[in-house]
Swiss-Prot record:
Residues 1-45, 103-117, 181-205, 271-291 are extracellular. Interacts with IL8. Interacts with GNAI2. Belongs to the G-protein coupled receptor 1 family. It is a multi-pass membrane protein. Gene3D superfamilies: Rhodopsin 7-helix transmembrane proteins. This is C-X-C chemokine receptor type 2. It holds the Pfam family 7tm_1. The lineage of its organism: Eukaryota, Metazoa, Chordata, Craniata, Vertebrata.
């Protein structure tokens, strides 16, 4: 057939592509319904399983330690620490789903529709809550350093309300996954877990992808760029060396988040534009998108275990807090404790909770 002159709709008019949806979690294509025969359905599945297993172990251990250190230090807990506590909780909840995703890479989705919805929801909530919490941290740092404001963020009930609101908004943004994900069975391939919106799939895809990505990624990203831009300018102008050093942890956390999730978001945007025919779809482009989705998804999954490593290597206060816990329980000598062991990851904050 002539790939240049005919559209895919004309070439495959007799086929039903209403359920042909590219999931962020499981097989990006189903050979019996896809307009192109994929060159490669997925990255080597056993390689992916090994990565998932390592991320699961590192995330489980690392985020548990982060939560332990923050929860143990009630007196010196800063506003930023509360946000980081919720960030660790989100990563930990997602990590608990990784064994299920790993098994599905080998055997297909054998866990039914209920678990399909639950683990997909946890992944989306982890993504949205992560960037929303980072946006809140950027606002907190902006108020504390640029405006020297303490009154807005030092009240405990307000910080708790903000965190609860972030979880609620993240659930709302992830609601399409909860509503439309299900186990899909197709001939010649293993069962899969992905969105199924029936005959309205094409009509809803743009709305259900672009809106959550806009409000759950682009808007918080713009907030962070604004806040950290002015924060950095203030730090350099005032030569606030100590606070500048304390901000290294937060900047590292934000940078790692963007490096892990921005590529996936861009590829998902390209996939959405292609599926809604804003960008012409060809077999070559389809295969490139498939491979990019697989690769960038793995990069995003890696993020759930990286924050504790940042705290361990860059966050001096986290190391001090962990050593303090070990000393209290007699695992190390108290003489090895540093003089300043306040367990706040980022130094002074705009308030304490």
């Amino acid at each position: 057939f002539n790939m240049e002159s005919d559209s895919f709709e004309d070439l495959w008019k007799g086929e039903d592509f209403s359920n042909y949806s590219y999931s962020s979690d499981l097989p990006p294509s189903l050979p019996d319904v896809a307009p192109c025969r994929p060159e490669s359905l997925e990255i080597n599945k056993y390689f992916v399983v090994i990565i998932y297993a390592l991320v699961f172990l590192l995330s489980l251990l690392g985020n548990s330690l982060v939560m332990l250190v923050i929860l143990y230090s009630r007196v010196g807990r800063s506003v930023t620490d509360v946000y980081l506590l919720n960030l660790a909780l989100a990563d930990l909840l997602f990590a608990l789903t990784l064994p299920i995703w790993a098994a599905s890479k080998v055997n297909g989705w054998i866990f039914g529709t209920f678990l399909c919805k639950v683990v997909s929801l946890l992944k989306e909530v982890n993504f949205y809550s992560g960037i929303l919490l980072l946006a809140c941290i950027s606002v907190d740092r902006y108020l504390a350093i640029v405006h020297a404001t303490r009154t807005l963020t030092q009240k405990r009930y307000l910080v708790k309300f903000i965190c609860l609101s972030i979880w609620g908004l993240s659930l709302l943004l992830a609601l399409p996954v909860l509503l439309f994900r299900r186990t899909v069975y197709s001939s010649n391939v293993s069962p899969a877990c992905y969105e199924d919106m029936g005959n309205n799939t094409a009509n809803w895809r743009m709305l259900l992808r672009i809106l959550p990505q806009s409000f759950g990624f682009i808007v918080p990203l713009l907030i962070m760029l604004f806040c950290y831009g002015f924060t950095l300018r203030t730090l350099f102008k005032a030569h606030m060396g100590q606070k500048h050093r304390a901000m290294r942890v937060i900047f590292a956390v934000v940078l790692i988040f963007l490096l892990c999730w921005l590529p996936y978001s861009l590829v998902l945007l390209a996939d959405t534009l292609m599926r809604t025919q804003v960008i012409q779809e060809t077999c070559e482009r389809r295969n490139h998108i498939d491979r990019a989705l697989d690769a960038t998804e793995i990069l995003g999954i890696l993020h759930s275990c990286l924050n504790p490593l940042i705290y361990a290597f860059i966050g001096q206060k986290f190391r001090h807090g962990l050593l303090k816990i070990l000393a209290i329980h007699g695992l190390i000598s108290k003489d090895s404790l540093p003089k300043d062991s306040r367990p706040s990851f980022v130094g002074s904050s705009s308030g304490h909770t």
